């Protein structure tokens, strides 16, 4: 399954420069637990913004830069330059998961292809420059979990 995972505030804000506009430990733990030991796909700017150690994941970096050489962050990395063929083995596969982890351009390209979405909504409004507008109509809300500072909504694509 191809799943997009992200956090946003109540206005759809997902970033400020190349960082998160908030620092919520429980939400970061949710992201870590969900993606640990999994395959993740992200853009090069998102990869470069990660902490120095981002281990225990297979990271695929989507970039148009044919000369991109990712710095070592303690994880297996592979650079890819197109996503359509890459995501095929994951699509609709119940036991093989690929998590789409940003940034905004990668989400915009891949959310329509996703089997599922995992969306953390941070309570409150923050300042930043990266917003994500998502058409949720192809998806059905299947579960929602509330925490003190955010809630997590799980969506699955509606079979057509």
UniProtKB/Swiss-Prot annotation:
Query: What reaction(s) does this enzyme catalyze?
Result: (6S)-5,6,7,8-tetrahydrofolate + NADP(+) = 7,8-dihydrofolate + NADPH + H(+)
Query: Any idea which UniProt keywords this protein has?
Result: NADP, One-carbon metabolism, Oxidoreductase
Under the heading PROSITE patterns, the entry gives: DHFR_1 (PS00075), DHFR_2 (PS51330)
Pathway involvement?
Cofactor biosynthesis; tetrahydrofolate biosynthesis; 5,6,7,8-tetrahydrofolate from 7,8-dihydrofolate: step 1/1
- Quote the record's binding site residues for NADP(+): 6-7, 14-19, 43-46, 62-65, 101-106
* Biological process terms in GO annotation: dihydrofolate metabolic process; folic acid metabolic process; one-carbon metabolic process; tetrahydrofolate biosynthetic process
Q: Does the keyword Manganese apply?
A: no
Its GO CC terms are:
cytosol
Q: What class of enzyme is it?
A: oxidoreductase
Q: What is its EC number?
A: 1.5.1.3
Q: Where does substrate bind?
A: 5-7, 27, 32, 57, 120
Q: What SUPFAM superfamilies has UniProt attached to this entry?
A: Dihydrofolate reductase-like
Q: Name one GO molecular function term.
A: NADP binding
Residues forming the DHFR domain are 1-160
Keyword check for Oxidoreductase, yes or no: yes
Family to which the UniProt record says this protein belongs: Belongs to the dihydrofolate reductase family.
Provide the function of this protein: Key enzyme in folate metabolism. Catalyzes an essential reaction for de novo glycine and purine synthesis, and for DNA precursor synthesis.
Name listed for the protein in its UniProt record = Dihydrofolate reductase
